[in-house]
């Protein structure tokens, strides 16, 4: 089937946006726009997350965007939703099903900042969203919700280790602060030093107070 320039068609809910009929173009889903927006957010900042910038980066016309999103604000909400689902909800569900041993789960949680390129990329996205949150209420609300959810999950781990409710919350806050610090201060220390810090925090967090 021939497609005219600057024309889009819909195949089973997926938009095909074609600028040049000379060659095939990529099928775009809403998630493709969300991922592209996240990349621009990390590399250039929130002010550059615009429909024209994303369309140019994806090699499509702006019309494809409006098949999936009502506005730029709608896209930004989806970016925050995707980030929250990937980094908080799916993570806690995955860890919850990985082991019933709270000691093993604690080791898994503490090791999260060191899990290769995927962890590094997740940290870059999170730092970009936190920078965005300093000037945008919607982003700040998403960050606050994610922080509260993660700290709450950590507190459940410490409760399972036998600590009282108040102490479990305090330890959860300290552990989460360490995890955030490892992302922010990722250039501090070589891999061996980072492992040493991680092992120290693991021992410290499981040690009862005198």
Residue ranges of predicted features:
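Residues in soluble alpha-helical coiled-coils and helical-bundle/repeat scaffolds
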Residues: 70-74, 78, 96, 100, ...
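Hydrophobic/aromatic-rich alpha-helical bundle segments in the mid-to-C-terminal region
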Residues: 140-144, 159-210
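Helix-turn-helix
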Residues: 29-32, 36-74, 78
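Short, basic, alpha-helical segments at the C-terminal edge of helix-turn-helix-like DNA-binding modules
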Residues: 81-88
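Solvent-exposed, amphipathic alpha-helical segments
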Residues: 32, 36-44, 90-94, 129, ...
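N-terminal intrinsically disordered/low-complexity leader segments
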Residues: 1-28, 209-210
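Hydrophobic alpha-helical connector segments
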Residues: 78, 92-123, 175
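Amphipathic alpha-helical packing segments from all-alpha helical-bundle domains
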Residues: 88, 104, 119-127, 134-162, ...
């Amino acid at each position: 089937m021939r497609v005219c320039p600057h024309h889009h068609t819909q195949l089973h809910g997926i938009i095909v946006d074609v600028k040049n009929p000379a060659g095939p173009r990529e099928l775009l889903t809403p998630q493709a726009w969300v991922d592209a927006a996240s990349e621009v957010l990390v590399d250039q900042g929130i002010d550059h997350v615009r429909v024209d910038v994303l369309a140019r980066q994806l090699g499509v016309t702006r019309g494809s965007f409006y098949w999936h999103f009502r506005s730029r604000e709608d896209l930004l909400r989806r970016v925050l939703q995707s980030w929250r689902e990937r980094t908080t909800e799916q993570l806690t569900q995955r860890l919850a099903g990985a082991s019933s041993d709270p000691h093993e789960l604690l080791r898994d949680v503490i090791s999260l900042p060191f899990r290769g390129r995927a962890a590094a990329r997740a940290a870059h996205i999170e730092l970009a969203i936190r920078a965005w949150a300093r000037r945008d209420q919607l982003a700040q609300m998403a960050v606050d919700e994610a922080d509260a959810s993660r700290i709450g999950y950590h507190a459940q781990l410490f409760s399972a280790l036998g600590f009282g409710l108040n102490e479990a919350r305090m330890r959860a806050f300290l552990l989460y602060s360490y995890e955030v610090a490892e992302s922010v201060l990722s250039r501090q220390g070589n891999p061996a030093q980072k492992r040493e810090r991680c092992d120290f925090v693991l021992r410290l967090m499981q040690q009862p107070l005198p």
